[in-house]
């Protein structure tokens, strides 16, 4: 129901609205309600031998076709199999039964790609031995191409080279340093579906002899799910359950985004689901779990984690156009509550030698903060402080950030440093 606003001078009634300039989020379960398959379009008109040469020479010349890459990957990987030790299903799709032997492309529905296959340069010197490392290299370039930071990019490329050399000692990189022809491969939906299928398969068969192919594909898992990762990180850094962490959400925007992320039926907590690959499988064009669609939650969670001395949180992206003041206060209060209390209790005993706390002793002075992590107690105390951070809270935050150095712009670490280390 729309809320109307009345102009005082002449009683004109208006209904304030903002332009709908953002696409709505798309959930993976909705995709499978409309379709029971994930189509993968592959050209299968050329032999694996031809495709191997096309890809090898194309990489060396800097003129490789993504259609050749996809067709080669399909040809080289389609016979890789794994035997299930349990039933495997996701979103009502029966992938396989316990005891079944399945392949990577049983996760998708392979269809013929229409059109003429681009020309390629053959290379008769390439053999089936290349199929042990060339797929790893092609899939690894996906991970390298996702980052634009030169130092990290070089680190990933060096790691990929080492992975390939473990299979073939004579391996030499086919793409010269500085060439970025593979950066755009991530825009090809068939390539990303292969990446997702490979990672999902080897996530199930972690001990498979070809599981090292995940070096490049692992970033496909939970792609565009940064806010969901923030939630998991916050649970770990606080040592609190998902339920207890949720009770510490004190801002309407954060609560709205939490409701958005926790929509039932999405298989978030099912490890062998299609859900972690919702972007690369094309199940969603707008992830409900990204930091872009959950900026307030992401900021609040990462700021709290940073104030609890998380090294990972320092480089988390700082969102734009959010209500920083309230979110900062909420994060500070939560971090202060966790950082000021130790969740200690005897876990084992010998015989009956157990410590029993005496709840009848002690008590709080007027301004003393609570000793536990109960959000109700902390909110009551915060009300007594006129809902403003106390000097001790500000000192706590300053101690948490004062040693941070080399911070990048537009990061949570940079924001917290400027906010608390004054």
UniProtKB/Swiss-Prot annotation:
<keyword id="KW-0946">Virion</keyword>
<feature type="region of interest" description="Interaction with the phosphoprotein">
    <location>
        <begin position="350"/>
        <end position="390"/>
    </location>
</feature>
<protein>
    <recommendedName>
        <fullName>Nucleoprotein</fullName>
    </recommendedName>
</protein>
<dbReference type="InterPro" id="IPR023330">
    <property type="entry name" value="Rhabdovirus_ncapsid_N"/>
</dbReference>
<feature type="binding site">
    <location>
        <position position="317"/>
    </location>
    <ligand>
        <name>RNA</name>
    </ligand>
</feature>
<dbReference type="GO" id="GO:1990904">
    <property type="term" value="C:ribonucleoprotein complex"/>
</dbReference>
<keyword id="KW-0543">Viral nucleoprotein</keyword>
<feature type="binding site">
    <location>
        <position position="408"/>
    </location>
    <ligand>
        <name>RNA</name>
    </ligand>
</feature>
<keyword id="KW-1139">Helical capsid protein</keyword>
<feature type="binding site">
    <location>
        <position position="206"/>
    </location>
    <ligand>
        <name>RNA</name>
    </ligand>
</feature>
<keyword id="KW-1035">Host cytoplasm</keyword>
<comment type="function">
    <text>Encapsidates the genome in a ratio of one N per nine ribonucleotides, protecting it from nucleases. The encapsidated genomic RNA is termed the NC and serves as template for transcription and replication. The nucleocapsid is bullet-shaped with the tip containing 8 turns of a conical spiral before reaching the helical cylindrical trunk. Nucleocapsid assembly is concomitant with replication, therefore viral replication depends on the intracellular concentration of free N, termed N(0). All replicative products are resistant to nucleases.</text>
</comment>
<dbReference type="GO" id="GO:0030430">
    <property type="term" value="C:host cell cytoplasm"/>
</dbReference>
<comment type="subunit">
    <text>Homomultimerizes to form the nucleocapsid. Binds to viral genomic RNA; this interaction contributes to the virion assembly. N in the nucleocapsid interacts (via C-terminus) with the P protein (via C-terminus); this interaction allows to package the L polymerase in the virion and positions the polymerase on the template, since P acts as a bridge between N and L. N(0) interacts with the P protein; this interaction prevents the uncontrolled aggregation of N(0). Interacts with the matrix protein (inner layer); this interaction contributes to the virion assembly. Interacts with the L polymerase.</text>
</comment>
<keyword id="KW-0167">Capsid protein</keyword>
<dbReference type="Pfam" id="PF00945">
    <property type="entry name" value="Rhabdo_ncap"/>
</dbReference>
<dbReference type="GO" id="GO:0003723">
    <property type="term" value="F:RNA binding"/>
</dbReference>
<comment type="similarity">
    <text>Belongs to the vesiculovirus nucleocapsid protein family.</text>
</comment>
<keyword id="KW-0694">RNA-binding</keyword>
<feature type="binding site">
    <location>
        <position position="143"/>
    </location>
    <ligand>
        <name>RNA</name>
    </ligand>
</feature>
<dbReference type="GO" id="GO:0019013">
    <property type="term" value="C:viral nucleocapsid"/>
</dbReference>
<dbReference type="InterPro" id="IPR035961">
    <property type="entry name" value="Rhabdovirus_nucleoprotein-like"/>
</dbReference>
<dbReference type="InterPro" id="IPR000448">
    <property type="entry name" value="Rhabdo_ncapsid"/>
</dbReference>
<feature type="binding site">
    <location>
        <position position="152"/>
    </location>
    <ligand>
        <name>RNA</name>
    </ligand>
</feature>
<dbReference type="GO" id="GO:0019029">
    <property type="term" value="C:helical viral capsid"/>
</dbReference>
<feature type="binding site">
    <location>
        <position position="214"/>
    </location>
    <ligand>
        <name>RNA</name>
    </ligand>
</feature>
<feature type="binding site">
    <location>
        <position position="286"/>
    </location>
    <ligand>
        <name>RNA</name>
    </ligand>
</feature>
<keyword id="KW-0687">Ribonucleoprotein</keyword>
<dbReference type="InterPro" id="IPR023331">
    <property type="entry name" value="Rhabdovirus_ncapsid_C"/>
</dbReference>
């Amino acid at each position: 129901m729309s809320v109307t606003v009345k102009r005082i001078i002449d009683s004109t009634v208006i209904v304030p609205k903002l332009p709908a300039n953002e696409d709505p989020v798309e959930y993976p379960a909705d995709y499978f309600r409309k379709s029971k398959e994930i189509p993968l379009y592959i050209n299968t008109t050329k032999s694996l031998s031809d495709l191997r040469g096309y890809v090898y020479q194309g990489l060396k010349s800097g003129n490789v076709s993504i259609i050749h890459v996809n067709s080669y990957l399909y040809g080289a990987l389609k016979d890789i199999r794994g035997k299930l030790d349990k039933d495997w299903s996701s979103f009502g799709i029966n992938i396989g039964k316990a005891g079944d032997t399945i392949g990577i492309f049983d996760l998708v529905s392979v269809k013929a790609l229409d059109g003429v296959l681009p020309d390629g340069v053959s290379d008769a010197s390439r053999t089936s031995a290349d199929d042990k490392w060339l797929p790893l290299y092609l899939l690894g370039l996906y991970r390298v191409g996702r980052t634009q930071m030169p130092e990290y990019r070089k680190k990933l490329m060096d790691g990929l080279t080492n992975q390939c050399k473990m299979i073939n000692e004579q391996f030499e990189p086919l793409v010269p340093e500085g060439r970025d022809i593979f950066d755009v491969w991530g825009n090809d939906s068939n390539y990303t579906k292969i990446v997702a299928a490979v990672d999902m398969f080897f996530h199930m068969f972690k001990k498979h002899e070809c599981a090292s192919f995940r070096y490049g594909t692992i970033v496909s898992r939970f792609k565009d799910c940064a806010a969901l990762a923030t939630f998991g990180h916050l649970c770990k850094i606080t040592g609190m359950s998902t339920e207890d962490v949720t009770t510490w959400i004190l801002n309407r925007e954060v609560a709205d985004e939490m409701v958005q992320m926790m929509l039932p039926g999405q298989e978030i907590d099912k490890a062998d689901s299609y859900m972690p690959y919702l972007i690369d499988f094309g199940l969603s064009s707008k992830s409900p779990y990204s930091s872009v669609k959950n900026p307030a939650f992401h900021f609040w969670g990462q700021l709290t984690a940073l104030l609890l001395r998380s090294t990972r949180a320092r480089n988390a992206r700082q969102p734009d156009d959010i209500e920083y003041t309230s979110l900062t206060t909420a994060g500070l209060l939560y971090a202060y509550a966790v950082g000021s209390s130790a969740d200690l209790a005897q876990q084992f005993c010998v015989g009956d030698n157990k410590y029993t706390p005496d709840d009848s002793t002690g008590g709080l002075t007027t301004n003393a903060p609570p000793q536990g992590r109960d959000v109700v107690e902390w909110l009551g105390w915060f009300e007594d402080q006129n809902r403003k951070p106390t000097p001790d809270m500000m000192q706590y935050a300053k101690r948490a950030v004062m040693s941070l150095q080399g911070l990048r712009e537009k990061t949570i670490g940079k924001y917290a440093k400027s906010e608390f280390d004054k």
